Curated annotation (Swiss-Prot):
Residues that coordinate or bind Ca(2+) 1: 146, 152
Summary of the tissues where the protein is detected: Expressed in splenic antigen-presenting cells including B-cells, monocytes/macrophages, and dendritic cells (at protein level). Expressed in spleen and lymph node and slightly increased with dendritic cell maturation.
UniProt subcellular location: Cell membrane
Extracellular side of membrane: 70-238
Name of the protein: C-type lectin domain family 4 member A
Keywords attached to this entry: Adaptive immunity, Calcium, Cell membrane, Disulfide bond, Glycoprotein, Immunity, Innate immunity, Lectin, Membrane, Metal-binding, Signal-anchor, Transmembrane, Transmembrane helix
CDD domains per UniProt: CLECT_DC-SIGN_like (cd03590)
Gene: Clec4a
Motif ITIM motif: positions: 5-10
Pfam family for this entry, one: Lectin_C
Residues annotated for Ca(2+) 2 binding in this entry: 197, 199, 203, 219-220
Binding residues for alpha-D-mannopyranose: 197-199, 203
Length: 238
């Protein structure tokens, strides 16, 4: 009896392929976090804050400028009014220079005009110490005279009394360091000292005085002595 042979079909599932196929499937993408633009550190909020700050600064600057302009305009008006009030007490000379935009060069009454300055020799009763003389000039908007040229020296001496001495705006600050009251640099080449002067370290104020043999020149004396003086101020242009 022939034996029966039974055939069975056996199929094997390829697990590796299945696993491989599973592994190659794309993973689900992660969701990116959305930034909240309303948070304090966001660029838009910083930009807004910066613009507000710049606006406030601009407003502040504008207000300050308006206030400054108003005060400056007021000062000009007051200065103009003061000149108008003083005009009746001024002695004026018409300018002949076409380069000057102002027509008149003026000095207060009793003052003398020379160059760009006005000069005043106070009255006989006005003798005072050097400090007091400077104070008297200052109250008139002037200072003790500062001499810067031979021409100026000659003009000043031409209006002085040869029998008196006059304080000028030169004083010794210490160790023979001479200084002008208006801070003009002191230059040895533009000085008019008498021979042998200055002569004493204790005499710290300068006068202009006439000597019979040598004429007008400068002399140092004690600041506390009472002398006449010469005041100087810038001319007024109208």
């Amino acid at each position: 009896m022939a034996s029966e042979i039974t055939y069975a079909e056996v199929k094997f599932k390829n697990e590796s392929n299945s696993l491989h196929t599973y592994s190659e499937s794309p993973a689900a993408p992660r969701e990116k976090p959305i930034r909240d633009l309303r948070k304090p550190g966001s660029p838009s909020l910083l930009l807004t804050s910066l613009m507000l700050l710049l606006l406030l600064l601009a407003i502040t600057f504008l207000v300050a400028f308006i206030i400054y302009f108003q005060k400056y305009s007021q000062l000009l008006e007051e200065k103009k009014a003061a000149k108008n009030i003083m005009h009746n007490e001024l002695n004026c000379t018409k300018s002949v220079s076409p380069m000057e935009d102002k027509v008149w060069s003026c000095c207060p009454k009793d003052w003398r005009l020379f160059g760009s300055h006005c000069y005043l020799v106070p009255t006989v009763s006005s003798s005072a110490s050097w400090n007091k003389s400077e104070e008297n000039c200052s109250r008139m908007g002037a200072h003790l005279v500062v001499i810067q040229s031979q021409e100026e020296q000659d003009f000043i001496t031409g209006i002085l009394d040869t029998h008196a001495a006059y304080f000028i705006g030169l004083w010794d600050t210490g160790h023979r360091q001479w200084q002008w009251v208006d801070q003009t640099p002191y230059e040895e080449s533009i000085t008019f000292w008498h021979n042998g002067e200055p002569s004493s370290g204790n005499e710290k104020c300068a006068t202009i005085i006439y000597r019979w043999k040598t004429g007008w020149g400068w002399n140092d004396i004690s600041c506390s002595l009472k002398q006449k003086s010469v005041c100087q101020m810038k001319k007024i242009n109208l």
